[in-house]
């Protein structure tokens, strides 16, 4: 009998669902990595670099974002992107590996970014039509488009940004010199 929860967890009668999902994910990733390679070459400014540490694990990627302007200029922010078997039905899992003072990135590296949410309250959440290029652009924009922190993950950073911009900028520069 068909059991939805078992199916979601990757279990079914013949045990092949998870294998099929991994095959689909890897095929999508191969296509998307080619698109990202082209996008990387076409950059006017080198704002990001993507690496696949192991060719046998296409689903584990490392992204380095290097802002060229703004308060995060000069920093090198590393992210680990893990693409689950259920991709593209669920978003990749992204963790910031570089300690950074940012309203949307907390001290343990968790990230608040609509595109990374399965169930987002706005229209920018994850959908199967999204891809890794969208994720990369979203992560790059975290360091360029400081706009709205009503949904901040690092509350202290958001409050400092809105109440004392000079102190916020100083703390950002301090973190960049210490951790980047």
UniProtKB/Swiss-Prot annotation:
Cited InterPro entries: Ub_conjugating_enzyme, UBQ-conjugat_E2_core, UBQ-conjugating_AS, UBQ-conjugating_enzyme/RWD
Catalytic reaction(s) noted: [E1 NEDD8-activating enzyme]-S-[NEDD8 protein]-yl-L-cysteine + [E2 NEDD8-conjugating enzyme]-L-cysteine = [E1 NEDD8-activating enzyme]-L-cysteine + [E2 NEDD8-conjugating enzyme]-S-[NEDD8-protein]-yl-L-cysteine
Keywords, alphabetical: ATP-binding, Cytoplasm, Developmental protein, Nucleotide-binding, Transferase, Ubl conjugation pathway
Pathway(s) the chain acts in: Protein modification; protein neddylation
Subcellular location: Cytoplasm
Similarity remark: Belongs to the ubiquitin-conjugating enzyme family. UBC12 subfamily.
Name recorded for this polypeptide: NEDD8-conjugating enzyme ubc-12
Any one GO molecular function term: NEDD8 transferase activity
Summary of the function given for this chain in its UniProt record: Accepts the ubiquitin-like protein NEDD8 from the uba-3-ula-1 E1 complex and catalyzes its covalent attachment to other proteins. Plays a role in male tail tip morphogenesis.
SMART domains in alphabetical order: UBCc
Result of knocking out the encoding gene: Worms either arrest during embryonic development, or show vulval eversion at the L4 stage and burst at the vulva during the L4-to-adult molt. Those who survive to the adult stage display severe abnormalities in the structure of alae. RNAi-mediated knockdown results in severe male tail tip defects.
First-level EC class: transferase
Keyword Coiled coil: no
One Pfam assignment: UQ_con
EC number(s) reported in the record: 2.3.2.34
Domain UBC core: 24-180
Gene Ontology biological-process annotations: negative regulation of DNA damage response, signal transduction by p53 class mediator; positive regulation of nematode male tail tip morphogenesis; protein neddylation
Annotated catalytic residues: 112 (glycyl thioester intermediate)
Gene Ontology CC annotation, any one: cytoplasm
UniProt superkingdom: Eukaryota
Signal sequence range: none
């Amino acid at each position: 009998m068909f059991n939805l929860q078992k199916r979601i967890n990757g279990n079914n009668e013949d045990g092949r669902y998870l294998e099929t999902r991994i095959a689909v994910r890897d095929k999508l990733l191969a296509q998307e990595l080619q698109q990202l390679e082209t996008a990387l070459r076409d950059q006017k400014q080198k704002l990001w670099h993507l690496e696949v540490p192991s060719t046998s694990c296409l689903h584990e990627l490392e992204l380095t974002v290097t802002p060229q302007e703004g308060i995060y200029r000069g920093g090198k922010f590393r992210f680990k992107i893990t693409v689950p078997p259920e991709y593209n039905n669920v978003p990749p899992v992204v963790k910031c590996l570089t300690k950074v003072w940012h309203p949307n990135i907390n001290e343990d590296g968790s990230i608040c970014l609509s595109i990374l949410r399965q169930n987002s309250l706005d229209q920018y959440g994850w959908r199967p039509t999204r891809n890794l290029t969208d994720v990369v652009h979203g992560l790059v924009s975290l360091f360029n488009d400081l706009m709205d922190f009503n949904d901040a993950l690092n509350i202290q950073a958001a409050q400092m940004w809105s109440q004392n911009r000079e102190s916020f900028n100083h703390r950002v520069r301090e973190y960049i010199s210490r951790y980047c």
